[in-house]
């Protein structure tokens, strides 16, 4: 009996380890800009500690969906979102949700590097200061150093912390923006074409960083580069004309997709 019980426990543990853990769940998500409908009943679950790439031709709705995940669409006049999106168990569109806190939990890195017109140090310290994450300057110094290390930037800027963040190269600025997002201890990091304005060397550094960040964060990235999606993601979702066409393991999406539209897009037959 004991042996059977132990075997049952081991089987249960194995099953638990193999269970999929979803960090964010989107159910029947539609987005309207005034009378124009941009997304149609999207159902997409984002796996925890996984890089999920959103691909599709321009105007397909991938960036629109990305912005629903931390309510960035709230900043657009006339934008309306229906359906339900949860972060863990929290409905992020519930009226009781603190949007500032939500955007700390779900950070965003934009297409064009947008450092604040402040010192490198203050770029990182700004968010933790607002959210009360540091009790004193020593705490803040540690957060700044840790965040810059996470973004692979510390060794390049540790002697220049009081210089302006806008004086960095484009690739360094983007990593500074990633460090700024990391500084408030997010659970999810959204990236909207983070490498489109960067040269190949800077792009390689950001992609390497994405691989490292996946250990501690859930990442959703919009990219127009099929090669980048294949390199950095474990899951890929294909959008077309406001619809989610399919979502699957990246390897399968690029070798044997279920939908012909995905195959055509990946092969460059439309875009």
From Swiss-Prot:
Keyword Aminoacyl-tRNA synthetase applies: no
Q: Where in the cell is it found?
A: Cell inner membrane
Q: Name one Pfam family in it.
A: ABC_tran
The record's GO CC annotations read: plasma membrane
* Record flagged with keyword Translocase: yes
* Protein role: Part of the ABC transporter complex PstSACB involved in phosphate import. Responsible for energy coupling to the transport system.
Question: Per its record, how is this protein called by name?
Answer: Phosphate import ATP-binding protein PstB
Organism name: Agrobacterium fabrum (strain C58 / ATCC 33970) (Agrobacterium tumefaciens (strain C58))
Q: Which gene encodes it?
A: pstB
